[in-house]
A protein has these predicted regions:
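Membrane-interface alpha-helices at helix entry/exit sites of multi-pass transporters
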Residues: 82-86, 151, 181-186
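Membrane-interface alpha helices of multi-pass inner-membrane proteins
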Residues: 150-174
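TM-lumen/periplasm interface segments of multi-pass membrane proteins
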Residues: 2-99, 103, 122
């Protein structure tokens, strides 16, 4: 019965996301990744180098580019506790949406969500953008399956411009029904 009920998996999925929020967003020492992401936005605005250490702001190095500053912008302008909370919830919601779009039977989609829930929780407690990278790749796959290469390539380009992992999406070229449209729309984006 659990694998036939979106309500149960939705409560579990977003419940774990809320636990991650409570464990990290209100404890400044626990949201270092969010501070790195926020730094990308503010350093871009201030035209500062993105790939140098900022030990007074956070305790690691940034690996994200200028494009990412646009993604994090709505969260970066908020107080840390609120921006971090909404960042975690937005990433979780995006992945939930992407998995729900998969062309699988309902019980299989729920199974994927159930199996992925632990990894979601782990990544959410670290405020990782990898949650959305996976959502972008799943979304690209779904759009390829629907014959909408232009939307698939948008997801791939966003993934590629934010984190190099997005390059994996280029493998979907081989599954595209209209390969020329895939190439041209990818170049246009």
């Amino acid at each position: 019965k659990l694998f036939q009920n979106y309500r149960f998996i939705g409560v579990l999925w977003f419940g774990l996301s809320l636990v991650a929020v409570l464990q990290t967003a209100f404890r400044p020492e626990k949201h270092n990744n969010y501070l790195i992401f926020k730094g990308v936005f503010w350093h871009t605005i201030q035209q500062l180098p993105l790939y140098v250490p900022y030990p007074e702001e956070y305790f690691d190095m940034n690996h994200y580019g200028i494009f990412f500053s646009g993604i994090i912008a709505p969260f970066a302008v908020l107080p840390n506790w609120l921006g971090c909370s909404l960042w975690i919830l937005a990433n979780s919601a995006f992945l939930y949406w992407a998995v729900r779009q998969l062309p699988l039977p309902k019980c299989a989609v729920i199974g994927v969500l159930f199996i992925s829930a632990h990894d979601l929780y782990t990544a959410a407690t670290m405020q990782q953008f990898n949650i959305s990278i996976i959502a972008l790749l799943l979304g690209a796959f779904v759009f390829i399956e629907k014959g909408k290469s232009h939307w698939a390539t948008l997801f791939i380009v966003i993934g590629l411009l934010t984190k190099l992992y997005g390059i994996v999406g280029l493998a979907f070229f081989f599954f595209a029904k209209d390969k020329w449209r895939f190439v041209w729309s990818g170049l246009l984006w």
